[in-house]
């Protein structure tokens, strides 16, 4: 299965409990998949075109559950140059109301050119939800390699720059560029792509991405290839992804209360996902031993798990998909 389709299929099933995140995802999907249209210069309609059935079902269900509006679905079978099936979600009656509720219209009734205010002013969870919606609408992910990239096709420069800002809020570097009069937002760094997949909730896709990425890196080096077999590669990739996902969850649980020295260790784990503990210790300022950096990460996870249990929330391990819980490295 192509990586893009795998990611979109997984994102279409990510459970989201917080209302603000569901609103942000809906708004971003509508903004990047189509948006507002005027019919006969009078009637405002909402239209969104996506390329997977899962994304279409998720958007329709979310709009109904969050805002109480029903939408129409038109399936456009591919033909000629456009061979892929497309799914058009349309709302004619009540379109203006939905546009205002999602922030696609500002207070004066004008279309928003960037991202809606609730997303821009929302927390990190809303920024991740916006990226999830944008990817479901117009995202793609290429195979690991020299030209690897996660890319979102944007409806305009303002929307592209707003999405770059959302990534920055997530500590991920994304860049806006124009190609053939089309605005795009691109993430090219391999670790940053893994981080964004994790933040969007595509945990299984992260495993596939890291597995393919690590395999390619090893094939490029005869010495490294001699030191690893396939089982070790998979185990190493899965353990690195699992550790990073747990650290990411730990930092979310603790928020501003995490001690600085534990936060620094956690950030290093996220910034250098494939690095060994010894390598992490060397890039720490000041340098730490392998045991010292490992101890700080263990204390970070233990503190987060204790806090989560006291708050009745899933721990860093319980928040992982079942298939990842045995890959703790």
UniProtKB/Swiss-Prot annotation:
GO biological process terms on file: cell division; regulation of sporulation
InterPro entries: Homing_endonucl, Sporu_reg_WhiA_N_dom, Sporulation_regulator_WhiA, Sporulation_regulator_WhiA_C, WhiA_LAGLIDADG_dom
Keywords, ordered alphabetically: Cell cycle, Cell division, DNA-binding
Keyword rRNA processing included in the entry's annotation: no
Feature: compositional bias, Polar residues: 309-318
Keyword DNA-binding among UniProt keywords: yes
Residue span of region Disordered: 308-329
GO MF, one annotated term: DNA binding
Known DNA-binding region: 276-309
Pfam families noted in UniProt: HTH_WhiA (PF02650), LAGLIDADG_WhiA (PF14527), WhiA_N (PF10298)
NCBIfam families according to UniProt: DNA_bind_WhiA
Family from the record: Belongs to the WhiA family.
Purpose of the protein: Involved in cell division and chromosome segregation.
Protein name stated in the entry: Probable cell division protein WhiA
Organism: Cutibacterium acnes (strain DSM 16379 / KPA171202)
């Amino acid at each position: 299965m192509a990586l893009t389709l795998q990611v979109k299929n997984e994102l279409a099933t990510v459970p989201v409990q917080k209302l603000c995140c569901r609103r942000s995802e809906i708004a971003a999907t509508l903004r990047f998949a189509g948006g507002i249209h005027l019919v006969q210069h009078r009637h405002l309609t909402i239209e969104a075109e996506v390329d997977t059935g899962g994304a279409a079902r998720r958007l329709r269900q979310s709009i109904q559950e969050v805002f109480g509006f029903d939408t129409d679905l038109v399936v456009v079978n591919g033909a000629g140059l456009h061979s892929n099936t497309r799914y058009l979600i349309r709302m004619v009656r009540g379109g203006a109301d939905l546009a205002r509720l999602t922030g696609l219209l500002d207070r004066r009734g004008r279309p928003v050119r960037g991202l809606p205010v609730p997303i821009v002013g929302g927390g990190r969870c809303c920024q991740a939800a916006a990226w999830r919606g944008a990817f479901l609408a117009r995202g793609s992910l290429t195979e690991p390699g020299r030209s690897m990239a996660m890319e979102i096709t944007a409806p305009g420069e303002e929307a592209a720059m707003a999405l770059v800002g959302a990534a920055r809020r997530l500590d991920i570097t994304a860049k806006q560029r124009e190609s053939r009069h089309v605005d795009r937002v691109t993430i090219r760094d391999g670790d940053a792509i893994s981080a964004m997949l994790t933040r969007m909730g595509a945990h299984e896709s992260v495993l596939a991405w890291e597995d393919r990425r690590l395999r390619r890196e090893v094939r490029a080096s005869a010495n490294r290839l001699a030191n690893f077999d396939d089982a070790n590669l998979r185990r190493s990739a899965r353990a690195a992804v699992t550790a990073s996902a747990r650290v990411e969850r730990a930092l979310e649980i603790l928020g501003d209360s995490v001690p600085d020295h534990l936060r620094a260790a956690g950030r290093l784990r996220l910034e250098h996902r494939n690095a060994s503990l010894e390598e992490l210790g060397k890039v720490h300022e000041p340098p730490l031993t392998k045991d010292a950096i490992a101890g700080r990460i263990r204390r970070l996870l233990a503190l987060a798990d204790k806090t989560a249990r006291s708050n009745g929330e899933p721990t860093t391990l319980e928040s992982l998909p079942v298939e990842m819980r045995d890959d703790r490295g």
